[in-house]
Curated annotation (Swiss-Prot):
It comes from the Bacteria. The gene is carB. This is Carbamoyl phosphate synthase large chain. Residues 133-327, 671-861 form the ATP-grasp domain. One of its GO terms (cellular component) is cytoplasm. Residues 930-1060 are annotated as: Allosteric domain. It comes from Streptococcus agalactiae serotype Ia (strain ATCC 27591 / A909 / CDC SS700).
Length: 1060
């Protein structure tokens, strides 16, 4: 079937901010889809609220709207653009839900906009739990015994009929949001209440738990001519009961017999045909390990996280082809872009094993509930490719960047057997490491299989690794054993540890013995056809398939898995850097380990190495490719942390040199640099012991800001107000040592702002200054940033520009740098300097129209700023106001406190732009799903130090029609100062009128809660914040953010005046 000619303009809805359950995979799929549609000659209009994406670059679609993905704004854009069609299946759950809302509100019908790809009825049948159940029954496809409920009472009634355990699955939510496992009525009531609240259609499916079955996924494609194929099947290491996004996954499936594979494959193809899905679809199935009995768990009628994984695992570009199918092309007429000789109708074949491992945020959220279940908790993932399971698993392990290079974590030797077995039974994020430890202690596979329901086949592969560890320990420096373990994916570092020598010795020994990796091609066809893909993975085998060209090359290191503090922004910078390298006439080589991102799309670079970002793996690529140099600036802390070892190995690091990176990161050197440049900084000291820290704090005076050196995202950063808290911090939060000093600074309460700059060694370009709405003390990544600055005087701006120039030249920066300032009493202090790309780069690139990563890369390669058209120093400010607002994933992370402070907690960001601050703020809050009505009830429960300021804030909220509720201490202060309040209790006080109940019953429209540093662990305040998060009530833990929201509400309010 030829492509459709009756449509010309197509709107694509993106997935919005990155949250747990919906990450960078949708930037990858959305970018692919937009380019695919443009390739076919269609005009593409894109709507997305996330500025950190490649998808929202001007050249990806014909028209790009970075606007809130809400019914109000998408409708306005539809009315303005009048597209012929809408493609909603590439924007994750956000895109699907928006399409449903547009349809239900009659907008699509009114504007005559057709839905492309999957029809609304199919989305409904897959997403609406009741319709899905009916369809499965019609197809004779087995599903677990279940009931659709719209109330908690109905859930209890069903539970009484069939008993526990049960699983709750809310309709139309993402990443298992609001769902969970229930072993009793109390849990059922709690989870169902939350689930009904979070489901946009107030509907949950309550089903019999089939926890313990094998979880298998099929990624399938279908076109309008009913051609359908399986792109890839995948098997979860963890059984049903743990969300697939939180599970280790292998592709292809490893333990299925031919009969089982055929059974599940047929079911998946029957389902996609019955739903008449046109495009990609993910089918999740549960298989009884002891029989051929299976159940269909769910169907995602769209491109998903698993689609991105399947695309990278096979090389088959699902989103690109789904877009072509949506406009009428069929699989048998589209050429496979990898082989360039076969058609997309050929099912991919794999001659390797892919392992995906989730990356969890518990290194930042130590208080978080680590127990895994049906609600997703991972922020990102890594993928590794090997010739056997052991190799791919160990490569994935060391890609995670959690301080491990093997299936062993520190201090496990000291764990008692009881604790070990309990950790294995509980299924937390680190269970894999405890399983390996149990095997080291000779627990049987049968025992571990019965405790975990993990297939014995996988446990046996872990045993192989453990037995090889033993073999290594008993045969020190044995070359044959070395060869054997390298074939199974052991790292040089792990071998060095077992042999009690250093990594360099293992590396040299291996190279002398000729034990070197070769690089194999990912070609979708198991080498059956010729392939032109420059997409490689390492393995210890014969025949290297990565051919070296005569062209001079540059290697760019990516940023690895998405985690809090290092998100998709760094991937954005990496992709733009590669573009500039290619434009400059070099061969661009990318090395990265993240299957979700645009940078690991094989068509972006001249060569892609899908490998862990460790010294060993990077050096192996460098030894083969011999690039002119390596660029580290765009890979976040991941790449920067490799600088020292790469430099020592004689690798040419392009851009700012190691000694200058050290001058920015090393406290004493940085202080000396600032003194020499005559730039003020808050007084501070370095401490390597607890006593040094206490002495430093006494000299500075409390409060002090304490943090470890060399971190990203404010990891383990804290404001400390007394000696007791400081001693507690030094003994629990950090392990201070001469190699890992702790930085102790005076905490200045002032206005914070930051600058991204590009330096060529002689001149600098500052695209813009961003002013933070929240005062210093809230991490810059969690602050709302405004560009251009709204309250900074000309003198302050001139000082910031002057200090930026001095620092860029003084630190010999070549390329990107980010500087953070605090302004107190009209004096500018430098807080920190990062001589690399920062997370604000995409936002600033979008709003200034300066492709910063590209300019910086060309400067790194030797170009000068005078050769560009942007001039020097501060670039002229935009006449619009732009706001970057953080987005959080607290609903997914039980026990994680939502109180903002110096340690970063946000997972994503949105942008709001308009002609003035109030309108831009309104859009930013709406895009971040922080909506407040024009009037209602607002609770104040604030720290003593904030009461004076909170009083003024409460007065203005009252002036626009809000009723002020307050807890006792706050209410007494407000009443004494002439403000009438409604007294409410915290917990256990004023039983009928305490805050969590009021929130639950919909009586409260917003909560303002600030806490002094000494009361951070206050249990009542924690529960109040948690209640607000769980019920979706706007929560402000900074008075500055609450004041910004007031400005929005005030701008929407009319003035009511009595006639004089």
């Amino acid at each position: 079937m030829p492509k459709r000619t009756d449509i010309r303009k197509i709107m694509v809805i993106g997935s919005g901010p990155i949250v747990i359950g919906q990450a960078a995979e949708f930037d990858y799929s959305g970018t692919q889809a937009c380019l695919s549609l443009k390739e076919e000659g269609y005009q593409v209009v894109l709507v997305n609220s996330n500025p950190a994406t490649i998808m929202t670059d001007k050249d990806i679609a014909d028209k790009v709207y970075i606007e809130p993905i809400t019914l109000e704004f998408v409708t306005r854009i539809l009315r303005k653009e009048r597209p012929d069609a809408l493609l909603p299946t590439l924007g994750g759950q956000t895109g699907l839900n928006m399409a449903m809302a547009l349809s239900k509100n009659g907008i699509l019908e009114e504007l005559n906009v057709e839905l492309l790809g999957t029809k609304l009825s199919a989305i409904d049948k897959a997403e609406d739990r009741d319709l899905f159940k009916q369809l499965m029954e019609e197809l004779n496809q087995p599903i677990p015994e279940s009931e659709i409920v719209n109330s908690v009472e109905e859930a209890i009634q069903f539970a009484e009929q069939i008993g526990y355990p049960l699983i709750v699955r809310p309709a139309f939510t993402l990443g298992g949001t609001g769902g969970g496992m229930c072993d009793n009525q109390e849990q059922l009531v709690d989870i169902t209440t939350k689930g009904l609240k979070l489901s946009p259609v107030t509907q949950c499916l309550i089903e019999r738990s089939i926890a313990g079955f094998k979880e298998i996924e099929y990624e399938v494609m279908r076109d309008a001519a009913d051609n359908a194929l399986v792109v890839c099947n995948m098997e979860n290491f963890d059984p049903v009961g743990i969300h697939t996004g939180d599970s280790i996954v292998f592709a292809p499936a490893q333990t299925l017999s031919d009969v089982e594979n055929q059974l599940l494959r047929d079911a998946s193809l029957d389902i996609i045909r019955a739903l008449k899905i046109e495009g990609g679809c993910n089918v999740q199935l549960a298989l009884d390990p002891n029989s051929f009995k299976y159940y269909v768990i769910e169907v995602n009628p769209r491109v998903s996280r698993s689609s991105a994984l399947a695309s990278k695992a096979t090389g088959y570009p699902i989103a690109k082809l789904a877009a072509k199918i949506a406009v009428g092309l069929t699989l048998d007429e589209v050429i496979n872009p990898i082989t360039k000789t076969t058609y997309a109708m050929f099912e991919p074949a794999l001659d390797y094993v892919v392992a995906k491992m989730p990356r969890f945020p518990f290194d930042k959220f130590e208080s978080g509930d680590r127990k895994l279940g049906t609600q997703m908790k991972a922020t990102g993932e890594v993928m590794a490719i090997g010739r056997n399971i052991e190799e791919s698993l160990l490569k994935a392990c060391r890609s995670l960047e959690i301080g491990v290079d093997h299936i062993k974590i520190a201090d496990l030797d000291n764990v008692s057997d009881d604790v070990l077995l309990e950790k294995i039974r509980k299924a937390e994020d680190d269970r894999l490491f405890y399983l390996a430890e149990a095997l080291r202690r000779h627990y049987s596979i049968e025992k571990l299989a019965s405790l975990t329901s993990i297939d014995s086949f996988f446990l046996d592969k872990l045993r192989v690794i453990v037995e090889l560890e033993d073999l290594l320990s008993k045969n020190r420096l044995d070359i044959n054993i070395l060869k054997k373990v390298k074939n199974k994916g052991f790292s040089d570092k792990a071998i060095a540890s077992l042999w009690q020598i250093n990594e360099d010795q293992v590396r040299n020994m291996r190279k002398e013995a000729g034990i070197l990796p070769v690089y194999k091609m990912v070609d979708t066809c198991a080498a059956e056809f010729d392939s032109a893909t420059p997409y490689f993975y390492s393995t210890y085998a014969v025949e290297n398939e990565s051919l070296i060209s005569d062209k001079a090359s540059i290697l760019v290191l990516g940023s690895g898995p998405i985690r809090i503090g290092q998100g998709v922004e760094f991937d954005y910078a990496t992709v733009h850097s590669v573009k500039a390298i290619r434009e400059s006439g070099f061969e661009a080589i990318i090395m990265n380990s993240n299957p979700e991102t645009v940078s690991t799309d094989f068509s972006i670079s001249d060569k892609l190495y899908f490998e862990p970002l460790t010294f060993e793996d990077v050096m192996n690529v460098i030894d083969l490719e011999k690039p002119e140099g390596v660029i580290l600036q765009f890979g976040g802390q991941t790449a920067i942390n490799l600088a020292k070892d790469l430099n020592k190995a004689g690798v040419k690091i392009l851009g700012t040199q190691l000694e200058d990176l050290d001058r920015a990161e090393n406290r004493k050197q940085f202080e000396a640099t600032l003194q020499a440049l005559n730039i003020p900084q808050p007084p501070g000291f370095t401490a390597t012991t607890e006593e040094e820290a206490v002495n430093a704090a006494q000299k500075i005076g409390y409060p002090v800001l304490v943090r470890p050196s060399y971190v990203l995202g404010g990891r383990a950063m804290k404001i400390v107000e007394n000696e007791e808290d400081l001693r507690h911090y030094m003994t629990t939060a950090v392990k201070a040592s001469p190699d890992h000093p702790v930085l102790i600074d005076a905490y200045l309460i002032g206005k914070e702002c930051e600058v991204d700059a590009i330096s060529d060694g002689q001149n600098i370009l500052i695209p813009g200054i961003m002013e933070h709405i929240e005062r210093a003390g809230v991490h810059s990544g969690d602050s709302m940033a405004v560009y251009p600055p709204q309250t900074l005087s000309e003198t302050i701006i001139e000082t910031i520009v002057d200090y930026t120039k001095r620092l860029a030249i003084g630190l010999n920066c070549i390329g990107m740098m980010n500087i953070q300032f605090v302004i107190k009493d009209q004096k500018v202090y430098v807080i920190e300097v990062n001589p690399r790309a920062s997370r604000t780069l995409p936002f600033l690139s979008k709003v200034t129209h300066i492709p910063m990563a590209q300019v910086a890369t060309k400067v790194i390669l030797g170009d000068k700023l005078c050769n560009f058209t942007y001039g020097y120093d501060l670039y002229p400010a935009s006449d619009m106001v732009h706001i970057k607002a953080p987005v959080f994933s607290f609903t997914k992370l039980a026990k994680v406190d939502s109180l903002l402070g110096p340690e970063m907690k946000s997972t994503g960001e949105v942008m709001g732009s308009d002609i003035n601050l109030q309108k831009a703020l309104y859009k930013a809050f709406e895009a971040a799903y922080l909506h407040m009505p024009d009037y209602g009830n607002i609770v104040f429960t604030v720290d003593d130090t904030d009461k004076e300021e909170a009083l003024e804030l409460a007065k203005v909220y009252q002036s626009i029609g809000y009723r002020i509720y307050a807890t006792q201490g706050t209410a007494i202060y407000f009443d004494a100062n002439g403000l009438e309040t409604v007294l409410v209790g915290k917990l256990g006080e004023n039983d009928r009128n305490h805050i969590p109940d009021l929130i639950k019953n919909g009586k409260i429209q917003a909560v303002i809660n600030t806490v002094g540093q000494n009361n951070i662990d206050n249990h009542d305040a924690l529960i109040i914040r948690r209640s607000a998060i769980e019920q979706g009530v706007p929560l402000f833990t900074s008075l500055d953010t609450a004041h910004a929201m007031f400005k929005v509400l005030e701008s929407r309010a009319f003035t009511l005046k009595v006639l004089d």
